[in-house]
């Protein structure tokens, strides 16, 4: 098992290197706040929505912006060791779509079935799945929980952003 140094805020461990995650700005924060509220309202009770949680992905430690996890999820030293049901990455200044795709690929390979990528400045969003497909959302982003679809309306989310 890989041993990690005590993490600093927003520090990830990728490919045996510590990487400082960019700190979010206002649009990122608005979207993250909306997603936490939306998930808290829409998720069945056997799931939790958590922000900025360390997630172990093989030899990496990532910090997705938001994750949905079963209440029965296992932790080691406060880090999530079970796959999330959904990981959400919100683009921050200094990040690229390629950066977020790489992170989603690592999360999916570690067992997370779906990852959403959200780019607030461009009002664009994508779903990345375990089939290694990237699909741009036009009206909604979908996740499946207990064989039931849960759809996030993009227009509802974009309405949280200033014009």
What are these regions (language model features)?
Residues 1-163:
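Gly/Pro/Ser/Thr-rich low-complexity, intrinsically disordered segments predominantly at protein N-termini
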């Amino acid at each position: 098992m890989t041993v990690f140094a005590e993490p600093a805020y927003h520090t990830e461990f990728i490919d045996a290197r510590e990487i400082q995650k960019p700190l979010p700005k206002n649009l990122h924060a608005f979207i993250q706040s909306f997603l936490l509220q939306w998930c808290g309202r829409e998720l069945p009770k056997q799931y939790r929505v958590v922000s900025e949680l360390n997630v172990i992905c093989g030899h990496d430690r990532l910090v997705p912006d938001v994750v949905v996890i079963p209440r029965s999820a296992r932790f080691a030293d406060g880090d999530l060791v079970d796959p999330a049901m959904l990981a959400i990455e919100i683009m921050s200044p200094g990040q690229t779509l390629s950066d977020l795709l790489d992170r989603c690929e690592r999360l999916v390979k570690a067992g997370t079935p779906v990852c959403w990528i959200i780019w607030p400045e461009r009002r664009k969003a994508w779903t990345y799945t375990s089939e290694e497909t990237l699909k741009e959302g036009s009206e909604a982003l979908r996740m499946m929980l207990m064989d039931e679809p849960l759809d996030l309306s993009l227009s509802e989310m974009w309405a949280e952003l200033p014009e």
